[in-house]
From Swiss-Prot:
Subcellular location as annotated: Secreted
Gene Ontology molecular-function annotations: toxin activity
The protein, known as: U3-lycotoxin-Ls1a
Taxonomic path: Eukaryota, Metazoa, Ecdysozoa, Arthropoda, Chelicerata
Family as reported in the entry's similarity comment: Belongs to the neurotoxin 19 (CSTX) family. 01 subfamily.
Major localization class: secreted
Amino acid sequence: MKFVLLFGVFLVTLFSYSSAEMLDDFDQAAEDELLSLIEKEEARAKECTPRFYDCSHDRHSCCRSELFKDVCTCFYPEGGDNEVCTCQQPKHLKYMEKAADKAKKFGGKIKKWFG
């Protein structure tokens, strides 16, 4: 009976050690994957097209503003035959950002008042 009990304890210890090793390997793999995604995102973020610059080469490359991504808007200038595309912020998103800014400032004032 002692042998079975010791063998059982040995198996449980071995199983817990091996599962801990697998979890560590899994965590390391997940961490490496996350770091590679972050690096790709940083590289992609550097390639964005600023507001009011030409975005005809890639219409999805516009930079983000504080809350929303700018939109590539194309138009024909008066008297011209060539299409011009620039990154712009739609007016409704501009107003939403202003409202969010004012709400943040107002929230800060309320926080000051009530501590």
